[in-house]
Amino acid sequence: LYGDFVKGPLAGQWPADIEAAIRLHRRIDVFTDSHPLQLQARARFAVERRRYSGILLDVFFDHCLALHWADYAAEPLPRFTGRVYQVLAAEPRLPERLALIAPRMAAQDWLGSYREFAVLEQVVAGIDRRLSRPGLLIGGLAELERLYQPLLEDFRQFYPELQDFAARERGLSLYQDGFHK
């Protein structure tokens, strides 16, 4: 989660393992944003929404992952999200915005709630309010609903490739960051 909240260069302000995870998160973002299946999925959106389709797709893919979690992970989703919330609660130093929302995130099970498509309405509305020009995502949820099946197929093709990439990168970054000497 740190990767969504820590911006700019990493200069030792976080523990080495956290900075390694942030760097991995950033490499995953680059991989995702440039992947042909991601580009194909974005092209499904109406022209007027295509510029912001990556945001909508990210939210939708989070929904797909939560809904189909058992297809991609051995650990049940409630156990995984519970561990995430415990780590956040025990962490004395979180990025400022994450520290503000972590208690509510845990209390309302934000990560697990993505299973429900209806939750995406609140998520998209919240993101839209934070954009420099609010209103750009209006109609985005209806478009996700309309494109549900083809985008789900895009996710099912893409996610195993993302898992493979992340596993390779984790192996590389552990060595690069000096964890396995």
Segments and roles (model prediction):
Residues 1-181:
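N-terminal leader/auxiliary helical segments
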